[in-house]
Regions:
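Conserved Rossmann-fold NAD(P)-dependent oxidoreductase catalytic core, especially the SDR/UDP-sugar
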Residues: 4, 8-68, 72, 78
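A short glycine/threonine-centered beta-strand motif
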Residues: 222-230
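Mid/C-terminal beta-alpha module of Rossmann-like enzyme folds, strongest
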Residues: 143-194, 201
């Protein structure tokens, strides 16, 4: 089995590093898929992102392109009646307390006396636990027989500013603001996020989609990308 979870995932950084995003998130995936196909790997699970739904960011686009390549390979091999790994694609939301997520960052800022920095008072994100993420990977890997995309029901989105306030309270401290000027930790709004990044893409949550049945334009696009990156 192959579980492919490696990727560049920081949205703001990838907006300024487009080639690196495509080279790592797309071509890194392509290389693994090609090797898995050549070596007759039984199952291949690709960890994607909910930002691949109607992608508005470079990160989302790079992951969506990787999804399309996997589906293109599956369709091509299936049409030719050739041996093919059983591909599955899982779209993650934000994983609570994972490396690089906001929770370790906020906890670090709180431990240093603040401020806790939030990009916008309106920004919202869907979250899932580490256990939910692991179960999604394992179950989708076993269930998929046709390169389906699996998405976990993550409930309602959480406002990041509310999450910051909860973490401050859980630390036994209080928020410092106009209503409580003697509080312990200030929340600073940086206003450093584009409006289109405020909300995670909303779509059906715990579903398995039908496999993509498009044509072979992905292969042509891949070759064009190769020329540009070289």
């Amino acid at each position: 089995y192959v579980f492919h979870a490696a990727a560049y995932k920081h949205v703001s950084i990838l907006e300024e590093n487009i080639f690196e995003a495509v080279e790592n998130n797309f071509y890194g995936t392509k290389n693994l898929v090609d090797i898995a196909t050549e070596r007759n790997i039984e199952r291949f699970c690709f960890v994607s992102t909910d930002k691949a739904v109607n992608p508005k960011t470079i990160m989302g686009c790079s992951k969506r392109l990787a999804e399309l390549y996997i589906q293109s390979v599956y369709n091509d091999l299936s049409e030719k009646k050739l041996t093919c790994p059983k591909f599955s694609i899982v779209r993650f939301g934000n994983v609570f307390n994972s490396s690089g997520s906001v929770i370790p960052l906020f906890n670090q800022q709180i431990s240093m006396g603040g401020p806790v920095t939030v990009t916008s008072k309106d920004v919202e994100r869907y979250f899932m636990s580490i256990t939910e993420a692991v179960n999604l990977i394992l179950q989708s890997t076993e269930l998929s027989n046709d390169c389906s995309i699996f998405v976990l029901d993550m409930g309602s989105p959480i406002k990041i500013i509310d999450l910051a306030r909860r973490l401050i309270r859980l630390s036994g401290l209080s928020e410092k603001n106009n209503e409580n000027p003697e509080g312990d930790i200030e929340i600073k709004i940086t206003d450093s996020i584009d409006h289109c990044f405020l909300y995670d893409n909303d779509g059906p949550k715990i579903v398995s989609t039908s496999p993509w049945t498009g044509n072979h334009e992905v292969s042509a696009a891949t070759e064009e990308f190769s020329v540009v990156l070289d």
